[in-house]
């Protein structure tokens, strides 16, 4: 799915290879310069973050309201997948690698800063590929900050999910799946159609 999605972006003129190469270089850097335990802690933190993004995308209609139905269905599939395996890396980190509290929290802080940087960097690149001038790109990204981080913003409304990771004794399954998760499961089991399941997840959102 990821390869097909990236190819579709290439066909639309997006410089997706620069993004993929940047990610691959960063993965190689982390593998070379950090311990296996810390890399596992980073993986666990990434999994928690992506599970939180699944919540952000689909717990309320406003986030995906203007998305193409096919894109929304793909993102719904990915969101459900992230929610269902969100504890796997965490359990390996805790039970096998025996990563301690400090390293776990450090990895989450690392991931939060890194993903924030990537969001700005890649959004700017893709907008540039669309031919949008620099000044307008900066204005567009500045204008959306309130939508993301302001009062009842898309991200600020879910910071509790993120910060819960820093609690001693935390486990991902202490946080329940979003309220409309069962709507996706029921629709997919009944029809086998990700488009119908994605629509069901979206329609059941607040």
Language-model segment annotations:
Residues 1-206:
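Non-heme di-metal
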């Amino acid at each position: 799915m990821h390869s097909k999605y990236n190819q579709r972006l290439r066909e639309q003129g997006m410089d997706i290879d620069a993004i993929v190469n940047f990610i691959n270089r960063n993965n190689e850097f982390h593998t070379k310069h950090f311990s296996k335990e810390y890399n596992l802690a980073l993986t666990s933190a990434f999994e928690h973050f992506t599970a939180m993004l699944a919540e952000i995308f689909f717990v309320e209609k406003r986030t995906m309201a203007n998305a193409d139905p096919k894109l929304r269905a793909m993102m719904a599939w990915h969101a459900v997948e992230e929610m269902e395996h969100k504890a796997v890396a965490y359990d390996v980190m805790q039970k096998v690698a025996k990563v301690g509290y400090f390293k776990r929290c450090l990895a989450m802080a690392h991931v939060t800063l890194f993903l924030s940087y990537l969001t700005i960097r890649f959004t700017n690149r893709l907008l540039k590929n669309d031919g949008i001038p620099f000044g307008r790109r900066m204005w567009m990204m500045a204008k959306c900050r309130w939508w993301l981080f302001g009062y009842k913003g898309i991200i600020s409304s879910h910071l509790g999910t993120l910060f819960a990771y820093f609690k001693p004794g935390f486990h991902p399954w202490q946080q329940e799946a979003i309220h409309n998760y069962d709507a996706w499961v029921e629709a997919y089991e009944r029809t086998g159609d990700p488009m119908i399941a994605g629509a069901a997840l979206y329609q059941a959102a607040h």
